[in-house]
Amino acid sequence: MCIRDSVKTEAEAPDFAQWQTALNAIMPAGIHVTRVAPVEMKADSIAFACYCISYPAAAAAVLEQYNALETAPVEKHSKRGKKIVDLKEHIPQLRYTALGDTVQLELCLPAAQELNLNPSLLTGFLEEKFGLPAASANILRTKFLTADRQLFV
């Protein structure tokens, strides 16, 4: 998972490797800090969040059914209320790879102030429309991108 967090320090030259070691010592099992670094960009420059979603291999048929749809309307809830968003405008096709007993897809969704789409909108839609349990999805956020699709650091 990709999480961005910030801390303030009075140290003039913080030892980020030491921070990483200390953080890893207190992380829950299975969660590892892979990078500690000074902030280079402001959070408001994030425009997309990218994910790797895996399902059991049998889900491939459902992903193909999604690909055949012309529209995929979902109701998005936010602080500003509810609105209908067509997932096909943001995810026209689900391109996936079969890996053993799973299928894996990678996608980037809007993650800006104006529009922020969570992958649970897709997994919920696939469950509601085709019966593919959302709980069978393994969702991993892998990175953030800026509006020009550069890696957010």
Task: Pin down the residues of each PLM region.
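Conserved small/polar residues in nucleotide/adenosyl-binding loops
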Residues: 1-5
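Broad hydrophobic/π-residue packing in well-ordered secondary structure
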Residues: 7, 49-51, 94
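Short beta-strand-to-loop capping motifs
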Residues: 7-13, 53-59, 107-113
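General structural signal for secondary-structure boundaries
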Residues: 12-16, 117-118
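Short, glycine- and charge-enriched coil/turn segments that flank and shape catalytic ligand pockets
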Residues: 13-14, 60, 98-102
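RNA pseudouridine synthases
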Residues: 15-74
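Core RNA-modification/binding signature centered on pseudouridine synthases
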Residues: 68-153
